[in-house]
Amino acid sequence: MLTDLTFIHAADLHLDSPFYGISHLPEPIFARIKESTFASVRHMIDAAVREHVDFILLAGDLFDEANRSLKAQLFLKKQFERLRECGISVYVIFGNHDHLGGEWTPIEWPENVHIFSSAVPEEKSFFKEGRRIASIYGFSYQARALMENQAARYRRSTDAPFHIGMLHGTLSGSEGHDPYCPFTHDDLVKSGMDYWALGHIHKRQVLSAEHPAVIYPGNTQARHIKETGDKGYYLVHVTNGDISYEFQRAHDVLWEKAAVDVTEAKNMTALFQMVEDTFSKLRKKGSPVCVRLVLQGTAPEWLLEAPKGTLDEFLEALQEQEAEEERFVWPLRLDDETENEANLTNLDPFFGGLFEDIDRSDLSDVLEGLERHPVYRRHADRFSQEEVKEIKEQAQIILKRQLKVLDT
């Protein structure tokens, strides 16, 4: 008979993320962003204590680098000690970012922390009231690149009433991510697990709500503008063998993309008010926000005729007013994606051909060269088809903006 279980499933904490490219921000804002990966973990641990969960599953990439810092390790140790005081266990696997082949100063983890250090799946039991209630299976990466299917090796090995597989990897055929530790849905089903606690993909996804439940919780804190929306973990309840789960927010800083339609903006004052209204909505989300602002719609004549650099000045003005806000809405970028009413079809056919060339162009060679760079691979994912499409659209917008001069 299964005793009820409550646990947290999280992954991809990425403690010590460097947040490259934004160190020029005002010091208080950059400090808040840089510490956000740590703060999100604190939020999650607070919830674990509040909810009296039985255990926490951390499915890889707790640290952003294999050469993990002492600061990040000691921080995590302190959080785990808080859990120990409440009788909460922790089960950990390490992934491609924090693989066991790195170099660091080792520390001793509290006795409530159970680390799967093996290169192949192994079992660890969770006991409650003297009975084995759950068997948890997992392994850790020994080096960064693991291209073999390990999911097929998972099998039940005890008579526990509930079985959990922890795996840091990629569903075969998925795009936009390095295909580390690829697996198929059949691999997961054949294992006999009741719940699969996945990690590696930073966008939360429920791959299967049926038995077995297969879930990516996403990362606990976004680190760049490609990771928009709420970030956190799943709170899972097992009652009489039935599994229910709900997403819980943990992020400390929210990253968003916000579109502003400028078609009806009569002047710069009106545009400023539109952006202010957008900021007010974002501010109600309850945490500081980093936002990519996108101007869309038909560009009014006054904006087309504005001096060069006007939008750059506008962005600087918006940033200045947020520099001292504790719950800031910081505009990282201002992208002009507006359309010009001018009819570009009357231009030389050469220009029409340029637009067609952009649509047809294959960027794989260019992007693959970037994706192979070791620094890029440490801190970013592969480009998805959606992102490649966005690159092409941005190129067309820039071309249209330059051609407007020829059509006046």
From Swiss-Prot:
Task: Please provide, alphabetically and separated by semicolons, the GO molecular function terms listed in this UniProt record.
Answer: DNA binding; DNA exonuclease activity; metal ion binding
The highest taxon in the source lineage is Bacteria
Keywords assigned by UniProt, alphabetized: Hydrolase, Metal-binding
What causes induction of this gene? By mitomycin C and UV irradiation which requires RecA; probably a member of the yhaONM operon.
What species does this protein belong to? Bacillus subtilis (strain 168)
List ligand-binding residues for a divalent metal cation 1: E35, D61
Task: Provide the organism lineage as a comma list.
Answer: Bacteria, Bacillati, Bacillota, Bacilli, Bacillales
Note accompanying the cofactor annotation: Binds 2 divalent metal cations.
Q: Could you say which residues form the signal peptide?
A: none
Name of protein: Uncharacterized metallophosphoesterase YhaO
Cofactor entry:
a divalent metal cation
Q: Which residues bind a divalent metal cation 2?
A: D61, N96
Gene3D superfamilies annotated for this entry?
Answer: 3.60.21.10
Kindly list the biological process annotations in GO that this record carries.
Answer: DNA repair
CDD domains xref list: MPP_Mre11_N
Q: Which family does it belong to?
A: Belongs to the metallophosphoesterase superfamily.
